[in-house]
């Protein structure tokens, strides 16, 4: 019998998934959490001068068209697709917890805010204030899954006070250990092992909360001094047992996680990266977003259509790449993996 949610890794056969939306996407007005999380490399003057507010209409139109193309690919592979309930939040309004106020952000990247580990839905405690209410868009889906028997654990809502943040333009994260913070896009699921990136969007207290919540069935491995910005899925992407894509500019050979000992590695290098276009200055995602791929099963992977070198490397390892158009990956900060959250994958909990 299929469980209402079940996903233990990034590659088992995919059966059910959430795909995000660009509707209402917005760049928050000047806000400390936005500066520290996404733009810590900018001076306050540079950050304040950035364009803010809504995107041009064509960005939304093209992004939604591309997401529909992704949905079509998934449905042709017999994957059930859910979409966010965009009636829940008016993205033109502000968000506040009483101590601060800022604009809404977007729900383009469900992977950033939610994940499934085994038979459990996890809602993150995100570092970006503008995303404070974002998971409300998935509540209807989660309530249905809960009523069908799944576990559903939201993290404690963070205060996100000014004292949480420090503008760190170098290698160190721009959040402190004041309270548990975790964007679920900071983790890679590897069966019993959970790789956890310490960065601007996930701290050690967040890792401790996750370990305590999951219990002894899983082991959370904190990765320090690897990549201090946001999220892990343009740095490390396992494709199947024994094969992983690693970002050559971010993962030194002496920092490769031990779980990948004896695995084959596709090094996503400067030569391989095609340099995804940004349609705005100060795009929140780098050109490395091109390795943000989504596996349908261990032999099939959805890849941004420009990434021809990566697709060729996959084919040499027996993986069939499925190209998808995603014109605003850098602008809206999400490739096929980011804009999705798998709810059900076949397979069992294993040690890799």
PLM feature spans:
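The feature marks the mature, well-folded catalytic cores of soluble enzymes
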Residues: 1-352
């Amino acid at each position: 019998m299929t469980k209402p949610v079940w996903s233990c890794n990034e590659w088992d056969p995919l059966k059910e998934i959430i795909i995000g939306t660009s509707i209402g996407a917005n760049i928050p007005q000047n806000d400390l959490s936005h500066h520290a999380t996404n733009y810590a490399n900018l001076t306050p003057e540079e950050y304040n001068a950035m364009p803010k507010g809504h995107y041009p209409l064509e960005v939304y139109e093209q992004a939604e068209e591309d997401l529909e193309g992704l949905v079509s690919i998934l449905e042709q592979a017999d994957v059930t697709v859910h979409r966010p309930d965009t009636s829940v939040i008016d993205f033109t309004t502000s968000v506040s917890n009483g101590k601060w106020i800022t604009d809404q952000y977007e729900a383009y990247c469900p992977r950033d805010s939610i994940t499934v580990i085994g038979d459990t839905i996890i809602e993150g405690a995100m570092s970006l204030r503008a995303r404070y209410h974002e998971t409300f868009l998935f509540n209807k889906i989660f309530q249905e899954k809960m009523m069908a028997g799944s576990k559903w654990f939201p993290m404690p809502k963070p205060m996100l006070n000014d004292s949480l943040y420090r503008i760190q333009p170098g290698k160190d994260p721009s959040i402190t250990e004041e309270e548990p913070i975790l964007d679920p896009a900071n983790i890679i699921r590897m069966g019993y092992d959970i790789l956890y990136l310490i960065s601007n969007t996930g701290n050690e207290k967040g890792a401790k909360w996750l370990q305590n919540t999951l219990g002894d069935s899983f082991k959370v491995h904190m990765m320090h001094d690897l990549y201090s910005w946001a999220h892990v899925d343009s740095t490390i992407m396992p494709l199947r047992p024994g094969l992983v894509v690693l970002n050559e500019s971010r993962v030194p050979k002496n920092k490769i996680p031990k779980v990948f000992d004896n695995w084959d590695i596709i090094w996503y290098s400067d030569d391989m990266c095609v340099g995804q276009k940004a349609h705005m200055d100060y795009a929140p995602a780098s050109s490395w977003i091109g390795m943000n791929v989504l596996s349908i099963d261990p032999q099939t992977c959805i890849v941004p259509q420009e990434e021809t070198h990566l697709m060729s490397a996959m084919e040499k390892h027996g993986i069939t790449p499925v190209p998808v158009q995603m014109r605003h990956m850098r602008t809206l900060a999400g490739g096929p993996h980011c804009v999705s959250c798998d709810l059900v994958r076949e397979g069992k909990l294993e040690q890799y």
